[in-house]
Amino acid sequence: MSAYWIAVASAQHVRRGRNDGFMQVNHGKAAPLRRVKPGDGIVYYSPTTILGEKDGLQAFTAIGTVRYGKESPIKAKWAAASRRSGAMSNGRWLKKRRSSHCSTGWTSPLASRTGGITCASACSKSPITIFV
């Protein structure tokens, strides 16, 4: 059974991973990536364009499926840990209409085996509009 994940990262980090075929979450910590398996769905939410900036982007920036997940997290030049992934290769940028600042971090699986939804870093104060 596939799981579905919401990953939170700046748009710049999502773009780098998409271009180079890997994903990164939680400031490069490996533990969350060990839980991601081939076939899992990934949606990236970016509260900012660049890490540390407060530009209020608040957009879903990529969507896709993990292609390679059996290998352990790997080291990347610009990140502590990442996982080879096709999550960004077939994704496209999704934008929202309004903007305000929201916190970052890794979120728990969406629609997991238990069917529960847990989102540790969701910002309920500013709704997002997704264009598909």
Swiss-Prot record:
Belongs to the UPF0310 family. It holds the Pfam family EVE. This is UPF0310 protein msl8638. InterPro entries: EVE_domain, PUA-like_sf, UPF0310. HAMAP family: UPF0310 (MF_00771). It comes from Mesorhizobium japonicum (strain LMG 29417 / CECT 9101 / MAFF 303099) (Mesorhizobium loti (strain MAFF 303099)). CDD domains: EVE-like.
